[in-house]
């Protein structure tokens, strides 16, 4: 009788092994890709990104404006670093308006950073006006002004760029210095060049509309 029970148990074990094969554990990383499945490509040309300087175009800035949506006052900014120095973000200061984007932190030589600004949400009479500050690897600071006003009956688009000696943060003083005292450029749909000192020069373009773009290239003099 005992031998019969043992034989039955062995037979049951063999049957269960055949009928229930071991479950295969496939993690997400090892999951086979369907022939119709394509890898997702992330578009790096968005506000807050750092891209190759040579790929900075007006089309890139136009896409940033599109992403911002239907806002009456907005700006897409692209600044190309061909200075031979590394830039490190200090801060952004807004005299008017705001941005939801973090200022790109590290901008090596040969790269360009992308940023944006917009009027404050709601029925408020504000434009997009501010200053960006970047510390350069030579110990000096690059200040960049952008000004897109709300009321074009009284104001116009302006931009500026300047190298400050030593370490400086973007603030109201820097804004007023760049806007009133440091020969700003009008946003007039034209290119403007100037010497920045410290062995550098700039060339930039700003459109004249309320939904505008600003492209600046900083190179060795």
Swiss-Prot record:
In Swiss-Prot or TrEMBL terms, this protein is called Deep sea actinoporin Cjtox II
The record's function comment reads: May be involved in digestion of prey. Pore-forming protein that forms cations-selective hydrophilic pores of around 1 nm and causes cytolysis. Pore formation is a multi-step process that involves specific recognition of membrane sphingomyelin (but neither cholesterol nor phosphatidylcholine) using aromatic rich region and adjacent phosphocholine (POC) binding site, firm binding to the membrane (mainly driven by hydrophobic interactions) accompanied by the transfer of the N-terminal region to the lipid-water interface and finally pore formation after oligomerization of monomers.
The residues annotated as site (Important in the initial contact with the lipid membrane) are 155
Fetch the Gene3D superfamilies from UniProt: Cytolysin/lectin
Q: Where is this site: Interacts with the lipid membrane?
A: 202
Residues annotated as binding phosphocholine are 96, 129, 147, 149, 175, 179-180
The organs and tissues expressing this protein are described as: Expressed in actinopharynx and in gastric filaments. Is not expressed in tentacles.
Subcellular localization(s) per the UniProt record: Secreted; Nematocyst; Target cell membrane
SUPFAM superfamilies, A to Z: Cytolysin/lectin
Q: Which GO terms describe its cellular component?
A: extracellular region; nematocyst; other organism cell membrane; pore complex
**Gene Ontology MF: a single term:** toxin activity
Q: What is the lineage of its organism?
A: Eukaryota, Metazoa, Cnidaria, Anthozoa, Hexacorallia
Where is region (Trp-rich region, which is important for the binding to lipid membrane) located? 147-162
Which parts of the sequence form the motif Cell attachment site, crucial for protein stability?
186-188
Q: Which UniProt keywords apply?
A: Cleavage on pair of basic residues, Cytolysis, Membrane, Nematocyst, Secreted, Signal, Target cell membrane, Target membrane, Toxin
GO biological process entries: cytolysis in another organism; monoatomic cation transport; pore complex assembly
* Keyword check for Secreted: yes
UniProt signal peptide:
1-19
The source organism is Cribrinopsis japonica
């Amino acid at each position: 009788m005992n031998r019969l029970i043992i034989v039955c148990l062995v037979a049951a074990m063999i049957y269960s092994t055949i009928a229930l094969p071991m479950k295969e554990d496939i993690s997400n990383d090892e999951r086979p890709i369907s022939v119709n499945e394509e890898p997702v490509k992330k578009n790096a040309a968005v506000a807050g990104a750092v891209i190759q300087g040579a790929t900075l175009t007006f089309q890139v800035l136009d896409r940033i404006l599109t992403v911002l949506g239907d806002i009456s006052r907005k700006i897409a900014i692209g600044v190309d670093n061909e200075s031979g120095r590394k830039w490190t973000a200090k801060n952004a200061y807004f005299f008017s308006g705001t941005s939801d984007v973090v200022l790109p932190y590290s901008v090596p030589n040969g790269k360009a950073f992308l940023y944006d600004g917009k009027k404050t949400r709601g029925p408020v009479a504000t434009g997009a006006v501010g200053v960006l500050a970047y510390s350069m690897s030579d110990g000096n600071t690059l200040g960049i002004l952008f000004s897109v006003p709300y009321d074009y009956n009284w104001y116009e688009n302006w931009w500026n760029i300047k190298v400050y000696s030593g370490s400086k943060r973007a603030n109201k003083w820097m804004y007023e210095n760049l806007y009133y005292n440091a020969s700003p450029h009008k946003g007039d749909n034209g290119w403007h060049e100037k010497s920045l000192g410290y062995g550098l020069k700039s060339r930039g373009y700003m459109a004249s509309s309320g939904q505008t773009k600003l492209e600046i290239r900083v190179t060795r003099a």
